C-alpha cells in the first residue's frame, strides 16, 4: 500500500497575515512540481457561496503556481476525485462538509485516493 500523503493545517489565516500565507512554503514543498492542478472541495464553506470560496482559494493556489478546479462545478464529482492529482478541502462547518460528502458520493472515492497516496491538503474542517 502506498504511503499516505496528508498536509493537515489547523487554520487558513494567522493573525496579521493573508490567507494561507503561513502555509505557502509547506504547500509548495508538499505538492512539488509533479502536481499542476488541485481539486478543491468547498463543501465546508457556509458563510459565502461556493463560487466565492473557490475564487479566494484559486487566487492563492495560482500565486503558488497551481491550477485549481472545484468539485462543485463537475458533472461527475466522484470521477473528478478519482482523476485528481491532489485533493484540497477548505475549512468551515465540519457537519455541513461531512453531510455534503455523503450526499454527493465523494467520501469513499476520497478515502480511496488518500489510501492510494494522492496528496491531500486540508485546513480547519478540511
Regions found by a protein language model. Name each.
Residues 1-90:
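N-terminal beta1-alpha1 cap of cysteine-dependent amidohydrolase-like domains
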Residues 104-117:
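Catalytic-core regions built around general acid/base machinery
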Residues 88-91, 114-126:
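Catalytic nucleophile loop
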Residues 46, 94-95, 126:
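Short, catalytically relevant binding-site loops at active-site mouths
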Residues 26, 30, 100, 113:
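Residues that form generic nucleotide/phosphate-binding pockets
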Residues 94-104:
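Glycine/threonine-rich flexible loop motifs
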Amino acid at each position: 500500500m502506498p504511503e499516505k500523503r496528508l498536509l493537515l493545517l489547523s487554520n487558513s489565516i494567522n493573525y496579521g497575515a493573508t490567507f494561507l500565507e503561513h502555509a505557502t512554503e509547506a504547500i509548495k514543498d508538499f505538492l512539488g512540481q509533479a502536481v499542476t492542478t488541485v481539486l478543491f472541495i468547498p463543501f465546508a464553506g457556509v458563510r459565502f457561496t461556493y463560487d466565492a470560496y473557490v475564487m479566494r482559494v484559486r487566487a492563492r493556489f495560482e500565486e503558488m503556481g497551481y491550477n485549481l478546479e472545484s468539485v462543485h462545478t463537475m458533472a461527475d464529482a466522484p470521477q473528478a476525485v478519482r482523476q485528481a492529482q491532489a485533493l484540497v478541502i477548505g475549512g468551515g462547518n465540519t457537519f455541513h462538509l461531512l453531510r455534503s460528502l455523503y450526499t454527493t458520493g465523494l467520501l469513499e472515492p476520497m478515502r480511496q485516493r488518500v489510501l492510494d497516496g494522492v496528496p491531500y491538503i486540508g485546513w480547519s474542517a478540511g
